[in-house]
């Protein structure tokens, strides 16, 4: 996995330097659970946290990110949380 993470880091940096608009979403461990509609999103979430999130919540975040201007040219970690998706993205 270390090789994957290094390649991912380099790809993310290349995208950031490209001049293109981007949003990089880094979800935690993906679960086969129903969505809650509530997340935690931050530039960095410590590894000692419960880093799980449902696939459905990740999909919701990806769709909302298409129209939420506050996430343009940002990268963020994403896990299950207590904040509604729209609010969490606005607060990044």
Which functions belong to the PLM regions below?
Residues 1-92:
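Oxidoreductase cofactor-interface core, primarily capturing Rossmann-like NAD(P)-dependent enzymes
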